[in-house]
């Protein structure tokens, strides 16, 4: 079962909820997992991972790593108006499928090209 996620890899998002100073921060989406509806955002939800050395070249120790955040806790930032917005998906007359900003009605990107 795949969940629809309103953000894609490379989008800029703002965190809606979080502990302490995390809420309201902006970051870039590094990875989207549609299976469980989570996203990994650059520089947010940092956790410390204790890692054992696996080979003579890999060092062990405590490393900082981004943990997944549920997609409902992030909101897309429109590249046109720069505000956090909801996403509208629309199919144009020529068959092209696009994502639109609900605040400024600007096109965010093309999901599927028009069929020829």
Swiss-Prot record:
Keyword Iron-sulfur tagged: no
Matching InterPro entries: Rib_uL2_dom2, Ribosomal_uL24, Ribosomal_uL24_KOW, Translation_prot_SH3-like_sf
Keyword annotations: Ribonucleoprotein, Ribosomal protein, RNA-binding, rRNA-binding
GO cellular component terms, A-Z: ribonucleoprotein complex; ribosome
Family: Belongs to the universal ribosomal protein uL24 family.
Job description of the protein: One of two assembly initiator proteins, it binds directly to the 5'-end of the 23S rRNA, where it nucleates assembly of the 50S subunit.
Organism per entry: Acetivibrio thermocellus (strain ATCC 27405 / DSM 1237 / JCM 9322 / NBRC 103400 / NCIMB 10682 / NRRL B-4536 / VPI 7372)
Cysteines joined through disulfide linkages: none
Keyword DNA-binding: no
Subunit structure: Part of the 50S ribosomal subunit.
Name of this protein: Large ribosomal subunit protein uL24
Lineage of producing organism: Bacteria, Bacillati, Bacillota, Clostridia, Eubacteriales
GO molecular function: rRNA binding; structural constituent of ribosome
Gene: rplX
Domain of life: Bacteria
């Amino acid at each position: 079962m795949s969940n629809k996620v309103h953000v894609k890899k490379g989008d800029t998002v703002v965190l809606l909820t979080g502990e302490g100073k995390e809420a309201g921060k902006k970051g870039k989406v590094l990875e989207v997992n549609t299976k469980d509806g989570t996203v990994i955002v650059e520089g947010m939800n940092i956790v410390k991972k204790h890692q054992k050395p696996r080979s003579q070249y890999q060092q062990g120790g405590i490393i900082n790593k981004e943990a997944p955040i549920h997609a409902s806790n992030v909101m897309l930032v429109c590249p046109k108006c720069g505000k956090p917005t909801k996403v509208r998906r629309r199919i144009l007359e020529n068959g092209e499928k696009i994502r639109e900003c609900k605040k400024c009605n600007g096109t965010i990107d093309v999901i599927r090209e028009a069929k020829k």
